[in-house]
Design a protein with these regions (language model features):
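Active-site loop/helix belt of alpha/beta enzymes
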Residues: 268-276, 280, 284, 289-298, ...
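Structural preference for beta-strand elements that scaffold enzyme active sites
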Residues: 130-132, 170-172, 213-215, 238-242, ...
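Ordered alpha/beta subdomains of enzyme catalytic regions
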Residues: 1-209, 287, 318-323, 334-377
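Glycine-rich beta-to-alpha transition loops that act as phosphate-gripper elements at the mouths
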Residues: 135-138, 218-222, 296-306, 332-334
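Glycine- and Gly-Pro-enriched alpha-helical subdomains that act as flexible
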Residues: 170-278, 282-286
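Catalytic cores of alpha/beta
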Residues: 224-233, 302-320, 324
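Conserved catalytic-core segments centered on acid/base and nucleophilic motifs
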Residues: 74, 80-83, 294-307, 312, ...
Length: 377
């Protein structure tokens, strides 16, 4: 008997990947792409890799798999795996293969301790909309259980259908980097001018039901402010933006932001990734462009301590400007210190007209060298 998360893997998949696949299928966009998988931990003996490969082999189609194997040692930042296939054959597999790897690498989870982290995150959110984005970080068999805990502790929703039943709804989400990178690959290959973020927003609005909020990811090309302004200026419907700037980058404009005195840990104020300065700059930039109506969703490492710091910044921002700094929090680690989270990113695409692989990644996540990977399929 097959495990449910293999047989019904789409129910365990972050909804934005399923929506992206639907958009790409309907628009006929299907370049050959390369993904890379890595983690930021040194690991003496890998686990879960062979099982993830088996899942990809079973559910994928015409996918070239290059990977390390269970038992191999691993150094932080090197590739664990690379995958090559048409994007429509890969994009909806990501959540589950990461879940298989992350779950095995982390090992057993104390659900009582996890519940404490969920409760602390909810309490820290102080009434903000807070969503469970944890599916890729935990073993597939825990996704349903964790979603239930989140619902019981007050969260507003989750990213997977298997978990969303506890809210009597379906999984929700925004838009992923993969959608905009795929669109950029198509534009590059065909010599099409334009903004991939704006084009992704246009296609999302074209194909997705009108009741789904148009929350557009703005950090793919490290133009968190200007890409969203440019998208809105085209007249495309956009309801908000999500900021998920990776730890390799400073958010656009954040280094020039002057912050008031804030009673929070300095590590949350400035630096790379999603910081208070980056969200402050994004809100001010959108407002100054006349886009006060756009909501802001924040994600990337938001445990209870980080949420509390951002909520304090929101309080100060509201006192100064009379409106919220941000509106929605996406979280998934819940403060658990032993989590080993794997990440998967598009890093290249095959340009058929030129007959060669070309770099294609979100800014800061360029392709990593890989001498130890071996072909599995």
């Amino acid at each position: 008997m097959k495990l449910d998360f293999i047989e019904n893997y789409k129910a365990y998949t972050d909804k934005y990947f399923l929506r992206s696949k639907s958009i790409l299928e309907q628009e006929g966009i299907n370049p050959l792409v390369r993904y890379q998988v890595f983690t930021r931990h040194d690991i003496p003996s890998l686990s879960g890799i062979d099982e993830a490969v088996d899942f990809i082999k079973e559910k994928g189609r015409d996918i070239r798999i290059y990977s390390l194997k269970n038992g191999d040692s691993y150094k932080s930042g090197e590739p664990i795996m690379k995958l090559e296939a048409r994007v429509q054959d890969l994009v909806d597999l990501e959540t589950v293969y990461l879940s298989i790897m992350s779950g095995a690498l982390t090992g057993p989870i104390d659900l009582k301790l996890l519940r404490k982290g969920v409760r602390a995150s909810y309490t820290a959110s102080q009434g903000k909309t807070i969503l469970d984005f944890s599916a890729r970080h935990f073993a597939p068999e825990l996704v349903d259980k964790i979603a239930r805990i989140c619902q019981e502790e007050g969260f507003n929703g989750t990213s997977t259908d298997v978990g969303a039943k506890y809210w009597n709804t379906l999984g929700g989400g925004t838009t992923p980097h993969a959608l905009f990178l795929t669109i950029k690959a198509r534009m590059e290959q065909n010599g099409i001018q334009g903004n991939p973020t704006a084009e992704g927003a246009r296609l999302f609005d074209k194909y997705m039901p009108k009741e789904i909020p148009r929350i557009i990811l703005g950090c793919t090309f490290n133009k968190e402010i200007s890409d969203i302004i440019e998208t809105a200026e085209t007249g495309i419907r956009i309801d908000g933006t999500r900021i998920d700037t990776c730890g390799e980058n400073y958010t656009e404009g954040s280094q020039n932001i002057i912050l008031p005195k804030l009673n929070v840990n300095e590590k949350y104020l400035r630096g790379k990734g999603v910081t208070i300065a980056s969200v402050w700059g994004l809100r001010r930039g959108l407002d100054q462009a006349g886009l006060e109506n756009l909501s802001i969703a924040i994600s990337s490492g938001f445990d209870a301590e980080k949420i509390k710091a951002f909520v304090e910044a929101d309080r100060v921002y509201q006192n100064e400007y009379g409106r919220e700094l941000f509106n929605v929090i996406g979280t998934g680690s819940f403060g658990l210190k032993n989590l080993i989270m794997t990440t998967s990113d598009i890093c290249a695409y095959f340009n058929a007209k030129k007959g060669l692989w070309l770099p294609m990644s979100k800014v800061g996540r360029f392709e990593l060298p890989s001498k130890r990977l071996r072909r599995k399929q």
